[in-house]
Amino acid sequence: MSSSNKNRNTRSERMRRRRRKKRIIRGGLILALILAAAIVLVIALGGKQEEGTDSPSDENITISQSVPEEKEEDPVPTDTPAPTPEPLEISTEGLHSDYALLLRLRDDAVLMDKAGTEQMYPASMTKIMTALLAIENLPNLDEQITVTAEEINPAYELGASMAGFNAGETVTVRDLLYGVLLPSGAEACAALADRVAGSETAFVDLMNQKAQELGMENTHFVTVSGLHDPNHYTTFYDIAILLKYAIQNETFRTIFTTPSYTTSATEDHPQGIALGSTMFAQLGGDPKLDNGGVIEGGKTGTEDAAGHCLASLALIDGEEYILVTGHAPDSPDGTPYIIADARYVYNQL
């Protein structure tokens, strides 16, 4: 073969190899482009599918949800407000006493006041304080005390009421206390005062101290029994305060509400002394009221300047009341009007 033919064959072969190489490259590029396009398409389709799964269109999907029916709530029961009670109107027109004050113990409400804060003489209502202080200072009610002539004679000579103990007679503290509050015995007051404080004067100082402690601002005591003295005075409001405090003491309350009592036997009185409450005696043995209430107890007082007085305790419809009346005259039959006044006031409740 000639050299020129050989050269031509060689060039032809190289050209064929180049063309083949170009075809391979073009094919690879086309395949790469197709592959890239396929990848892009897959990614695009996958994104749309995720969007369709996670966020469905409100237009294409309807969610059915049952809404519970609202129940009508039963109306909450409300308490019917209690009617406001009308204020009590206690008339004083039918009273014979010139001084009177009615106190409701539950709330210290003064329901009636007829000169109840004006200065007045307490007479034997004084003995409420005397008995109270003796009880607070002599806890042993069975303690023996001998009554002396000095404790009896002055009171007797002044015409004071007496319990009936004799000079030299030895009796219990309990007997003396009943002697103070039931028959209003002045000698019993003196005997207790001497035992507690050593003298009546020293005991009176204790009485005035106690009055100040209780807020009895318009009260001043001079005697232990209530015998008249111009400087021995109080108001019926102060007496009501005193009695309210005193009845909180069980011993005082028991004695104050007792109609009668017999003292212990002594040589002078082998059968004891029969003591009776002056208030219960004037009630005629009938403490009941027309409205179903009852007068539970009381302490009377009688003295020229004070007239007839009464500090009483009543229970009406489950409520307790204290009524203090004073400067009442005798009725035509000689019975003090204080009992009629007490019934008149209490029956209005």
What are these regions (language model features)?
Residues 52-54, 58, 63-70, 74-237, ...:
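Active-site-adjacent loops and short helices of periplasmic peptidoglycan-processing enzymes
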Residues 2-82, 87-94, 99, 106-112, ...:
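Structured C-terminal helix/loop/strand segments within mature extracytoplasmic catalytic/sensor domains
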Residues 61, 87-99, 199-349:
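Penicillin-recognizing serine hydrolase domain
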